[in-house]
Amino acid sequence: LCRNVNFDLKRAEGYRNFCTNLLIATRFVLMNVEGKDCGVGATANEPMQFSFVDKWIISEFERTVKEVTTAYEDYRLDNAANAIYSFVWNQYCDWYVELSKVQLRGSEAEQRATRHTLVTVLEAVLRLAHPIIPFITEELWQKVSVTAGVRKSDEDAFLMLQTYPTFDAMKVDADAVARMTTIQAQIDSIRNLRSEMKLPPSQKMPLLISGPEAECAAAAPYLQQLARLESVTHVEDLQQAAQGSVAPVAIVGDSKLMLKVEIDVKAERERLSKEAARLAGEVKKCQSKLGNERFVSKAPAAVVDTEKKRLAEFTALLAKVEEQLDKLPAE
């Protein structure tokens, strides 16, 4: 089927930024793997301790390969490009590269596995993206392929002649994906707690976490790295440990998380009271509009729906602020 796609300068800028991000990621990988044991070639049989994070990024890559293959079979080049874009930017660069910084401080077997995963997944990504962005992938592949053990340093080879990635279901680890999904949700929740408490992202804070101890211990270094935490402390009973604190608590699966923050009760009461008054005003405005029969009957359905959503959002926020006010100790 013929599809007309309008040229969009903003989208072109976005893909330029994507290529820049791919270049930065490649520099990071090479800086950490060149001249070091990556578990390829002569050291391929040396022990490597792959973490659930390594297994997760490999699983995500395989999922992307499957998605890209389906897109090509359906003659949807746009879907193929979007799948590659999403994996490289959202999974590899935003998550795995950052998480790998934790593992590169681990044991030699952990470091070797992380270096191996960093470079082999990147090399495979360059092969996957080559038909869509041939020039930059060829340039980067020439630098990455030797370290990845794909070619020898004195061997002339071109990316366009390499085997294209194919989906391998055996490399998909559902358990690793599930564990990583929990870690991502925990990190997102901690960031939301920061935002809710108006804490700057640069300010490192201690975290209290309750839940299965082994899982919390495994997650702790990753939470500390990506959520910019001063420390992560496991407690059996968060409610008891946080007694007297007014900090909000996030619940993710079996775990509860709370930033340990010393709060000026008087200032916090004043701030929350102002916010509650503002939200109450917004709720009243929405209720007034929706209670007006002329507005409901004459306004477009989309406008009425938007107003209903605003009312629901403001009502939920007001309830949350009032809950925080109730938690404040008496002065």
Describe the residue ranges of each PLM region:
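Feature 926 captures the class I aminoacyl-tRNA synthetase adenylation module centered on the KMSKS loop
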Residues: 3-331
